[in-house]
C-alpha cells in the first residue's frame, strides 16, 4: 500500500525546470533534449521507444508490446491490454546528448496524459503508421502540440509492410495537418526485399543488419546512375523548400548559383533553424518492429529538435538548481519540502542529489504541487516575479489586480485544460471500513489524472466518477484493485449530457441574513441569454454603469465565481449548462457582508433563473472511423443507421477495405466494440473521439431524462 501511494505520487510529480543564460550553465543545457513521442493508438510509439533504449545501451534486450515486457508500459493493465495508459519518463544518452523522453498514450480516453506531458517537453516525435497515414488521434495530438507551440519531427513507421505507402503519409501531413513536411529520407527496397533507406541529404543508402537486432547498419554510396539522378533531384527539392523559409540558406543558394554546391552541414543547420521555428517538419522512415531506422531518428532528435534554451517561453524564464531537502514555495502559496529527487526510467528511479535547470526529474515529497505550478524559494521571489509579469500585462484590468486573492494561480499556473467527462458512474467501496481508503486512493489517481472527475452527490449520497470513456472507467477500477487492493463496485455508465437554456430570463434576488451577529445583505439582478462566446458580462447601460463601476474587483470576482459555478449543474439531469451568458445588471452588497455570502447569493440567483428559463438537453456526439472489408460495409452501415448515426463518407482503404466516417450519439454506442466484432466477424477495427454536442428530439430527450433518473 505504501509503495503504491509513493509510486502514484512519483508519477504525478514530474516537472521541468527551464532557464536561459546567464542563470544556468548553457553548455549543460545545450546537451539536453526533452522530447515527447505522440501517435495514434498502435502506430508503434512504445516499440520505437524500446528500440531507442536498447540502442542507447539502457536495456539489454528488446522489449515487445505483445510479450508484455516493455520498460515504459509497466502497469499491469498496460501489459495485459498491450496499450499505454500512463505517460512514462525515460532518460538515456545518445552521441553526447542527454535525451529525456516521455512515452505517451495513444488512446483518446487518456488524452489528458498527453496534455500534461507536453508541458514538460521542448519538442516531439510524431509516429505515423505507414499503412494508415494520419489517423483520428494523430490529428488530436498534433493539435495539442500546436497549442503548446512545439517543434516536431515525423517518423513514418511500419514501412517494411507491403501495404505501406510513404507518399500517402506525406500527402496526409499536408492535407489533414496543414504541415510542411521535409523528406530527409526515402524508402528503398534491397535486393533481398528488406527495407532500406535513402538519405536525401547525403545521397547514401542505409541498410540495417538483422542478425544483431539492428544494432549496426551499413552506409553505401549509390552506384546506379538513375538512383543518383533521382535522389539528387529530391535533394534539390529539399534545398528549394528550405531556402523558401530560411533566409541564410537562401543567401547561400543565390551566391553559389547552384544547389549542388550547398553542403550537407548547411542543409542540416537550416533544417534545424526551420524546425525550431516550426516552419517545417522533418520526415524520417523505418520499421521499429524490424529494427530499421531508429538510430537515425535519434540522430534527428539531436540535430533538429531544440534544447531547453531554444524552447519558446510563455513568460520570462526562471531558473536555478533544485536540491534534495530544499524548501520551496509554489505559486499556490504552499510551502513544500523536496524529500528526494530521482532520474526516471519508467517505473525505476535512480536517486540523485540535485537537478539543474533545463532537465527533467521526478520529485517526491510535494504534497500539493501539481503540473504547471511555479516553484520559488521565497515569497519575495514570487512577489517580484508577479510584479514583473503584471507590468507586461494590462494592469488596469480587474482580472489582474495585484490585490486579487487568486492572482498567483491565474498568472503563474499553466494548468492544462481538462476535457469534459463523457461518462459518469457511481462508485461504492466493498465495505464502509474501506470508504476512507477509497477516497484517498481516488485523490491520488485524480492528482495523477485530472481528467478523472470525483464528485459527491448530495441527493443520493453516492460518490460519482466522471471519465473520458468506458475504457477509462475500467482502468480506474482495475488500478484501484491492483495498486490499492480495493475491489470497488461501479454503477451503470451514465452519459454526460449538457444543458442549454430554452428562453432568456432576468430576475432580481434579495438575500438578507444575520450570521453570528453580523448582518449579511445582497441585492443582485442577473440575466441569462443564449451566447456561445462570452460566459459573463456586465450591463453597460446608462442606468447600471455607475453601480457596476463602483464595484470593488474582489466583489466582482466572487460574484462571477458564484454565478458561473451555478452553471455546472442544470435542473434537468444535473448536466453542465453551456452556450449561456450571465449578464450582471445591478448589485448592492451590504457593509461587512462576507465573500462566501455574496458568492452563494449569485449562485442562488442563477439557479432561480435556470428554473425560470427552462433547459433542453444536448447529447455528446462521437466522431468514428471504421475500417472494414468491402463485403462487411453494408451490414455495418445498417447497424449504425439504427443507432441514429450520420454517415459522413465511405472511401476506399486499400484494395479490400473501406473507411467509414461516422458521427454518432454516444448514448447509442454502449458496447459497440463488441457489436462491431460480431457484425464483421472480427475483421473490422474502430476508433472514436468526442466531436461536440447536439440537440435531441423530444422523444430521445424524454428517454434520456428517464434513464438519468433511474426510471428506465
Swiss-Prot record:
GTP binds at residues 39-46, 103-107, 157-160. HAMAP family: mEF_G_2 (MF_03059). Mitochondrial GTPase that mediates the disassembly of ribosomes from messenger RNA at the termination of mitochondrial protein biosynthesis. Not involved in the GTP-dependent ribosomal translocation step during translation elongation. NCBIfam families: small_GTP. InterPro entries: EFG2, EFG_II, EFG_III, EFG_III/V, EFG_V, EFG_V-like, G_TR_CS, P-loop_NTPase. One of its GO terms (molecular function) is GTPase activity. Residues 1-28 form a transit peptide. GO terms for biological process: mitochondrial translation; ribosome disassembly. Keywords: GTP-binding, Mitochondrion, Nucleotide-binding, Protein biosynthesis, Transit peptide. The gene is mRRF2. Its main location: mitochondrion. SMART domains: EFG_C. It comes from the Eukaryota. One of its GO terms (cellular component) is mitochondrion. It holds the Pfam family EFG_III. Belongs to the TRAFAC class translation factor GTPase superfamily. Classic translation factor GTPase family. EF-G/EF-2 subfamily. PANTHER family: RIBOSOME-RELEASING FACTOR 2, MITOCHONDRIAL (PTHR43261:SF1), TRANSLATION ELONGATION FACTOR G-RELATED (PTHR43261). The lineage of its organism: Eukaryota, Metazoa, Ecdysozoa, Arthropoda, Hexapoda. It comes from Drosophila virilis. Disulfide bonds: none annotated. This is Ribosome-releasing factor 2, mitochondrial. It is found in: Mitochondrion. Residues 30-309 form the tr-type G domain.
